[in-house]
Design a protein with these regions (language model features):
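C-terminal segments of enzyme domains that contribute to small-molecule binding surfaces
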Residues: 79-84, 89-92, 98, 115-181
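A generic local secondary-structure boundary/capping motif
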Residues: 6-9, 132-134
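A generic structural signal for short, non-catalytic loop/turn and secondary-structure boundary residues
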Residues: 7, 65, 137-139
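A structural motif detector for beta-strand N-caps
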Residues: 12, 18-20, 24-26, 30-32, ...
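A mid-sequence, solvent-exposed acidic-amphipathic segment
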Residues: 4-7, 17-19
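Sequence-level motif detector for i,i+2 pairs with an aromatic at +2
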Residues: 9, 15, 139-141
Length: 181
């Protein structure tokens, strides 16, 4: 059933009542836009923008943005339970991106048109290596995007803007052996 049939949360904007299920939790300041969906046992822990889908067992932090058609999915276990997943504060999931069975920390970016699962191979450009996405599960400050010339999604540590001496420049080079043929 719809959440708003039973309770109307204060300080929350819901564009389409049918898109928020009873049992969802929405913190004050949250916006669920027309294409957004929040299932039962899912929600926001601070003001957030949801234009994608939060499935059961998923929470997002303050300032998180789920852009159009993005999803965070916690698949059901054989006993029917869903492991809890969390997307950190100020994390952005790009248009048509999906994060399955993996948590992300604060200040992360998942670029558009990506499907990231724990066993998805990522290219870590900063140290020129391949590794599964599970190696950064729950960590803060990652950008994962498609980059021209790379087969795998490219993961880069986001520059810490709070520390002094950071040049703010990113290393956009890629190994020639990793380039798409």
């Amino acid at each position: 059933p719809r959440m708003v049939d039973y309770v109307v949360p204060t300080g929350v904007r819901i564009a389409e009542a049918e898109r928020v299920r009873l049992g969802a939790y929405l913190a004050s300041g949250t916006e669920v836009l027309r294409e957004g969906f929040v299932s039962y046992n899912a929600g926001t822990l601070g003001p957030a923008t949801v234009e994608g889908c939060l499935y059961s067992g998923v929470t997002v932090g303050e300032g998180a943005v789920l852009q159009h058609d993005s999803s965070v999915v916690s698949n059901a276990l054989s006993n029917g339970d869903r492991p809890a997943l969390h997307v950190g504060a100020s994390t952005v999931l790009g248009v048509n991106s999906t994060l399955m069975e993996l948590s992300l920390g604060d200040n992360c970016l998942l670029g558009p048109n990506l499907l990231i699962e724990p066993d998805t191979t990522l290219y870590f450009a900063d140290d020129d290596r391949l590794a599964p996405a599970s190696t950064i599960a729950g960590e803060d400050g990652w950008s994962i995007v498609h980059e021209p010339g790379n087969v795998e999604p490219v993961a880069r540590k986001v520059a810490d803007t709070t520390s002094t001496g950071s040049s703010g420049q990113s290393n956009q080079g890629s190994r020639s052996s990793r380039r798409a043929k």
